[in-house]
Amino acid sequence: MSSSSSIWDIIIDYLSLSSIWNYLQATLLGETSVPQQTNLGPLDNLAPAVQVILGISFLILLGVGMYALWKRSVQSIQKILLFAITLYKLYKKGSDFFQALLVNPEGSDLTLQDNNIFLSLGLQEKILKKLQTVENKVKDLEGMIISQKPTTKREYSSDHYCSCSDCQSPLPTSGFTSTSEM
């Protein structure tokens, strides 16, 4: 059983891509958390596979969501960014929870490190405000373009009959009806 266990470990190590993932997190996000070594038996072997599944599902959901939002309209860039940030946060929470579970399998005192949550929320809020101002400017430009278009004049007939739906009368009227005219 030792040979199948070592093959399983090789496959898990190959699929986990943990060194690439750690490098990307360290360079792009500034995260340098080093995973703690544990000796949990089967759970220790299962951890990289679960992280690979989380990563693949994150990428699939990100791709499907971005494609769906992109097909709706170009104005949904704000929604695409919000979707991507939210999906990444969900992935990060799941990954952090699983890491905390590996460290403490009993489940007591599971504390997740959210030291950058306020920073990321503030940055997200600033991005959303900027996108809203850009969206408002685009709407203003659309209004200006519409107002600059030449208005087409309707051709009126030489008849002076009332054409409103209330009084479709062939008689020329002033728009008011009184009992003395009848």
From Swiss-Prot:
Q: How does it sit in the membrane?
A: Multi-pass membrane protein
Gene Ontology CC: membrane
Write out the coiled-coil annotation as residue ranges.
122-149
**Keyword list, A-Z:** Coiled coil, Membrane, Transmembrane, Transmembrane helix
The places in or outside the cell where this protein is found are: Membrane
* Keyword presence, Transmembrane: yes
Transmembrane residue ranges: 10-30, 50-70
Return the protein name: Transmembrane and coiled-coil domain-containing protein 2
Tell me what organism the protein belongs to: Bos taurus (Bovine)
Q: What is the lineage of its organism?
A: Eukaryota, Metazoa, Chordata, Craniata, Vertebrata
Gene it is expressed from: TMCO2
